[in-house]
A protein has these predicted regions:
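Solvent-exposed alpha-helices and their adjacent loops that cap or buttress functional pockets
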Residues: 65-66, 83-85, 122-123, 127, ...
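A Rossmann-like FAD-binding core segment of flavoenzymes
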Residues: 18-119, 195
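N-terminal Rossmann-fold NAD(P) dinucleotide-binding loop
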Residues: 8-9
Length: 216
């Protein structure tokens, strides 16, 4: 499996729980590298503890597929010479999604293929608005709902606040699960408008659900 985001981790957890031998090839030193470091490091450790083989700092060079099911994934690793490979009955590539957009729509498309909008979802074509996966940012349904509300209120002549991207919650339904909302410590430290930054850790050993399930 190639990737270290939500889709890769959810499939890795599901197949691993079903008894399959799963190998995860990731480019960084931990999964969910865009999240808080502690969250990514902890989930990496727990996935390994549950039997998922995680190969870090790996760059896939090519994939060989046969006539039948099965694929050999070739990769190199940072700090190591030569190319290595791993074989599997199924190779899943989960390295992100691209929006399906077209310049023929008459709106500006950015370098990553997203429809360019202002903070209220307005494109540069009068009367045309954009929400959801075609816009830059988290490709999450609840974010799109909030964008839709902002657009509707703007059209109605109200004065809504733009969607605060930092408060959009994210969750990965892996085993164990991971959730995130707000700024990471690193992101907060990079902002000049924040004077004081505090971090609080809540141990899962104090969570009743985790204790009952034996996943604390």
């Amino acid at each position: 499996m190639i990737g270290a985001g939500a889709i890769a981790l959810e499939f890795a957890s599901m197949w691993n729980a079903a008894g399959s031998k799963v190998t995860l090839l990731i480019r960084k030193d931990r999964v969910l590298s865009a999240w808080d470091r502690r969250a990514g490091t902890t989930l990496t450790r727990e996935l390994k503890r549950h039997g998922v083989n995680i190969i870090t700092r790996a760059s896939v060079t090519h994939v060989d597929t046969g006539a039948n099911l099965g694929a050999t994934v070739h990769y190199t690793r940072e700090g190591q010479d030569g190319e290595q490979s791993v074989w599997g009955e199924i190779a899943l590539v989960a390295i992100g999604r691209d929006p399906i957009t077209d310049p023929a729509w008459g709106v500006t498309i950015d370098d990553h293929g997203h429809v360019a909008t202002d903070a209220y979802g307005r494109t540069d074509k009068p009367g045309v608005w954009a929400v959801g996966d075609v816009t830059a940012g988290h490709a999450l349904a609840h974010r799109a709902f909030e964008q839709g509300i902002v657009i509707a209120e703007t059209i109605a002549g109200l004065n809504p606040k733009p969607v605060d991207e930092a408060t959009v919650p994210q969750i990965v339904f892996s085993f164990p699960e991971a959730a995130s909302v707000g700024l990471t410590v690193e992101q907060a430290q990079a902002r000049e408008d924040l004077i004081e930054i505090k971090e609080t850790n809540y141990p899962m050993l104090a969570n009743a659900r985790m204790l009952m399930r034996g996943t604390a």
